[in-house]
Amino acid sequence: MATVTTHASASIFRPCTSKPRFLTGSSGRLNRDLSFTSIGSSAKTSSFKVEAKKGEWLPGLASPDYLTGSLAGDNGFDPLGLAEDPENLKWFVQAELVNGRWAMLGVAGMLLPEVFTKIGIINVPEWYDAGKEQYFASSSTLFVIEFILFHYVEIRRWQDIKNPGSVNQDPIFKQYSLPKGEVGYPGGIFNPLNFAPTQEAKEKELANGRLAMLAFLGFVVQHNVTGKGPFENLLQHLSDPWHNTIVQTFN
């Protein structure tokens, strides 16, 4: 008969004394020692160590050489080799950052109005009917205006990626300018609470942005399948959790 004893470092049981590696950006490691002790005159102990290193999205799978783990959110995941070109990598880093921010705003804009309408605070259409509303201009006119404005913004953002700091000065109102900073984190008026772009904050923002992009895709697919919004689907599921599920929906 044998007993299995698990020995863990004290830091595991004191989460307040240390932060996870993916939050701190350090090359932290997770150590677990397992000891197997046989009851008898002679006890034998064996142990092994498991290490989770920065830049390994799957432990044991080597990351590409061009992904060193120095970037926020870099876990070595690039199966198609899209970031092998350094110039492409610069663009992908900023593209993911901006799309994640838009996704977080979009998901909040899809979910919160539906929730507030359901509880009677406001009365607005669902996100999928918002385009049917009558605005101060036609939808085609608004599309053209939006296209021109976003084209201007994206051109300047690309210039900032190619030559950091080159667009900090307002081209029209010369008295306004942004402080020098890292690309993608302009500061100034875009950072009213004066949050510092620490490695921990960058990791959290990217994690939430990636989750929001998946949530946005899920909301769109969910509506195409059920014809309802995310909050309505949640309420329907909670009313009968064993029968109102994705299984019954596809059946």
UniProtKB/Swiss-Prot annotation:
Entry domain remark: The N-terminus of the protein extends into the stroma where it is involved with adhesion of granal membranes and post-translational modifications; both are believed to mediate the distribution of excitation energy between photosystems I and II.
Family: Belongs to the light-harvesting chlorophyll a/b-binding (LHC) protein family.
Entry binding sites for chlorophyll a 6: 237
GO biological process annotation, one example: photosynthesis, light harvesting in photosystem I
Superkingdom to which the source organism belongs: Eukaryota
Additional notes on this entry: Light emission at 715-720 nm upon excitation at 440 and 475 nm, and subsequent transfer of excitation energy to the photosystem I core with a relative slow rate of 25 nsec(-1).
Subunit annotation: The LHC complex consists of chlorophyll a-b binding proteins. Red-emitting heterodimer with LHCA1.
Species: Arabidopsis thaliana
Major location category of this protein: plastid
GO CC field: chloroplast; chloroplast envelope; chloroplast thylakoid; chloroplast thylakoid membrane; cytosol; photosystem I; thylakoid
Keywords, in A-Z order: Chlorophyll, Chloroplast, Chromophore, Magnesium, Membrane, Metal-binding, Phosphoprotein, Photosynthesis, Photosystem I, Plastid, Thylakoid, Transit peptide, Transmembrane, Transmembrane helix
Amino acids binding chlorophyll b 3: 138, 154
Induction trigger: Induced by low light (LL) but repressed by high light (HL). Inhibited by cold.
Compartmental location: Plastid, Chloroplast thylakoid membrane
Name of the protein in question: Chlorophyll a-b binding protein 4, chloroplastic
Post-translational modification: Photoregulated by reversible phosphorylation of its threonine residues.
Protein function: The light-harvesting complex (LHC) functions as a light receptor, it captures and delivers excitation energy to photosystems with which it is closely associated.
Residue positions binding chlorophyll b 4: 157
Membrane topology: Multi-pass membrane protein
Record lineage: Eukaryota, Viridiplantae, Streptophyta, Embryophyta, Tracheophyta
Entry binding sites for chlorophyll a 1: 77, 96, 210
The encoding gene: LHCA4
Gene3D superfamilies: Chlorophyll a/b binding protein domain
Entry-linked InterPro entries: Chloro_AB-bd_pln, Chloroa_b-bind
Annotated chlorophyll b 1 binding sites: 57
Binding residues annotated for chlorophyll a 4, in chain numbering: 208
Modified residues (Phosphoserine): 35
